[in-house]
Amino acid sequence: MASNRHTSPWWWIPTLYFAEGVPYFLVTSVSITLFTQLGMPNGQMALFTSLITFPWVIKPLWSPFVDVIRTKRWWVLLMQALMCISVFLLAWLAPQGYFTTALIFFTITAFASATHDIAADGFYMLALSDKQQSAFVGIRSTFYKIANIFCQSLLLMLVGWLQKHTSVAASWTYTLLGCSGLLALITLWHSLFMPRAESELSPTLKTDTQTPIRQSIWHEVGTTFVEFFRKSGIGLALCFMLLYRLPEALLLKLCNPFFLAAKDAGGLGLSVETVGQIYGIGVVLMLLGGIVGGLWASRVGLRKAMLPMALCLTLPSFVYVYLAAVQPDSFWVISACIGIEQLGYGLGYTACMLYMIHFAEGAHKTAHFSLCTAVMFLGLMLPGMVAGYIEEPLGYLGFFWVVMACCIPSIAITYVVCRKL
């Protein structure tokens, strides 16, 4: 068995970060298309698919417990097995209309995925030397992004292809069973090839052996929270993290329902397979935008880059106004519009990440960055909860005009932040 300290990172890093991405995108993206196709109204769909992302908001609360209870490797394998079982049950329950039970298992998948994130990132730092960590940072990022393409494009294309030969419910059952089987194979693979790190006890707790573990954990959590909320400019930073992605938070919940809705209902009347193809193009351009945005920000500096990148994130949302008003039939016109929007999203999201890295600088950089991402998730979750209820009385065209109006606070808070940098 290759389960030892000297296993090459190539044997487990690609699959580890692919496994980190798949359940995340299943919960945050694929669930929207699933419930839309199964007939859930937009208001309920947006509300419930937002609520099931709550584990990523509160993830920092239990992160210290993962550091001290058992090992990171144990947590990784346990969470992968739990996600495998949860998705397996989803495959049978959701397509049959057991929505409440399905939402419970989506929430379990989300909790397991959030915990897996903590354990995987911690294991990465324990199992690799500093030199190896630097060498593989691009690899882990690449395979996480491949998981994005897999879920938002390839899975939807598979669902659409299956729907040509079977029912909507059966197509989702077969697809989710395939995802469960893939997660099972990855879990087995990691049980064989993930190395056993020599020491996985939290350094903080090693230095204080006289203090009970539980007391040490809560002291560490409390100190981290207090110092975070005492940071200079915390009020402005929180406003930025909550408002910067406001237009995107609304769009995320209604994009796919808009694509799938019939034209007489204000949508584009696309098949699931076509939506997957369009997002295949869009996600690639989003990744390109992220690369270009990072390079440009490093060249001109965050202060000069932030406002233009915020405009790149928000203003391309206008393509949805155009699509809802014109309702074009051309695959290439629709793909070009989504490609522009996704390219802008990639550029704009980079600015958000760079600002959070900048704000988190200090004694507890990693923990404070985790809190920043939690606040950012809250900024996505809360608007997403009401997105469907905004769309239902207004229709898609009216809803997209509301999204454009929401660009104003996003750009305004970015302007204020830029002046303070």
Where are these regions (language model features)?
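C-terminal membrane-cytosol helix-exit motif in multi-pass small-molecule transporters
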Residues: S180-S202, I413-C418
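Juxtamembrane intracellular "pre-TM" segments in multi-pass secondary transporters
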Residues: A2-T7, A197-A237
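Helix-loop boundary and gating motifs at the non-cytosolic
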Residues: S3-W56, G235-F240, Y244-D264
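C-terminal ends and interior cores of transmembrane alpha-helices
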Residues: L77, A81-G97, L311-D329
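C-terminal transmembrane helical hairpin of 12-TM major facilitator-type secondary transporters
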Residues: R303-C352
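Loop-to-transmembrane helix entry
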Residues: M40-F54, D264-L285, V333, A367, ...
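Glycine-rich segments within core transmembrane alpha-helices of 12-TM secondary carriers
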Residues: W56, A135-V159, T373-G384
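Helix-to-loop junctions at the C-terminal end of transmembrane segments
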Residues: V57-T71, G289-K304, E391-E392
